Amino acid sequence: MKRELLKLSILEAHRCLKNKDFSARELTEAYIGAVEQDTLNAFVTTTPELALAAADRTDGLLQRGEPIHPMSGIPVGVKDLFCTKGVRTTACSNILKNFVPTYESTVSQKLWDSGAVMLGKLNMDEFAMGSSNTYSCFGPVKNPWKGTEGKDLTPGGSSGGSSAAVAGLLCAGALGSDTGGSVRQPAALCGVVGAKPTYGRCSRWGMIAYASSLDQAGVLARTVEDAAVMLNAICGYDQKDSTSSQEAVPDFLGGISRDVRGVRIGIPKEYELPKNRGDIAAMWDQNIKHLLDCGAEIVEISLPHTTYALPVYYILASSEASSNLARYDGIRYGTRVEGETIDEMYELTRSLNFGEEVKRRMLIGAYTLSSGYRRAYYDKAQRVRCLVIRDFEEAFKKVDCILALTTPVEATGIEEPLSAMDRYFTDVFTVPASLAGLPAISVPAGLSERKLPMALQVIGNYHDECGMLNLAAVIYEHSGGVLQHLHGF
């Protein structure tokens, strides 16, 4: 019985709770049991007492016959980048390993206000810098998928704990963050749905900053409808975030009609499929044919400056990171290493407690912001970013949504030696939408020859999450998802 509860989607569990097929406490206990047996290293902090208390509140509402939100009583995990009041929040870095916030992030508070149940905090790449979830002070996360080779694989990153937990049936949904693809890429590698809304739709207040002009909260779930429900719960204006959008938030779930007749889908000619990959080409062709059969129109578009998106992203993100992470010095909070002078204390605290990838990106950022090189790198990157945005604006005059691969590769082995450049390249299809602040979603679309998930990415126009989700739902319905191949449902 408990195993069957774990297989339910958020909306299925919601219907069962309303029908009193089981209680929120029973559902939560099933997930707590699964988390206790976690072999993926997905959770870094667990909160079973808080979870059961939240479940009991939902059961109380049901017993009194009061209406409940679709997220009420639903067990979820929270990426360890979001501050949770009274619960350790580390960004998976030694420099914050004992930090306990005194306040709650806006997006997690919105989840709790909807009645969601927090199972705990999820592993991630340190300070969200990475695409493999191997850069964590708590150790790497394992992908639930093994493929034909049967070896331990990375779940992607930086929200690797979130994607692995959802795919591994350790939570019904999860909060993640997406700076350059950190929700969509791990969702693709783990065979789940990962969505980021338009920049500003979700408050960044209480989310530990990596690159402030790019950071955006997102969600990971098993179905597109579940992602829509979670997005509705966390989106909305917040006066505590100066970049928060005041655009009204529509009913994302209600916008999913699966009618794509006349919808113009743009295919960027610059987004080439990987060569010598017949399985990816076949998956792509099958989905294009299905969309045409459903009445959609396929339009070739050009995004000429996306060729430069990846280097532009790493210049800008690293520059912002070097500024944002300057605050971690061991003085007011976080880990401190004593030295004979204050300068020595700063040096020891930061050099011994930041991981190698974080230090690499901070050094890149310090270099690109330095007086002798800022104009050549940072200022030029900002100008190219404007050109990338202009490309998308021109494209959306011709199309309603844009379709692309989420990532050019499947999950790689945890022990597989990859250079930093190889890892950066996994974000090549996700970074452009982040630079432009556009909503985007990754949808599982089939299995590769290695029996690993492949995914498509739908990019929507600004504040058109409904159109994006509707097209994604059609793609998901065609593939049927992929988790049934992993769990037998």
UniProtKB/Swiss-Prot annotation:
GO cellular component terms, semicolon-separated: glutamyl-tRNA(Gln) amidotransferase complex
Kindly name one Pfam family recorded for this protein: Amidase
Q: Does the keyword Cytoplasm apply?
A: no
Q: Where is the signal peptide?
A: none
So what does this thing catalyse?
L-glutamyl-tRNA(Gln) + L-glutamine + ATP + H2O = L-glutaminyl-tRNA(Gln) + L-glutamate + ADP + phosphate + H(+)
Q: What is its EC number?
A: 6.3.5.7
- Show the InterPro entries listed in the entry: Amidase (IPR000120), Amidase_CS (IPR020556), Amidase_dom (IPR023631), AS_sf (IPR036928), GatA (IPR004412)
- Report what the protein is called: Glutamyl-tRNA(Gln) amidotransferase subunit A
What is the protein's species of origin? Answer: Anaplasma marginale (strain Florida)
The upper taxonomy is:
Bacteria, Pseudomonadati, Pseudomonadota, Alphaproteobacteria, Rickettsiales
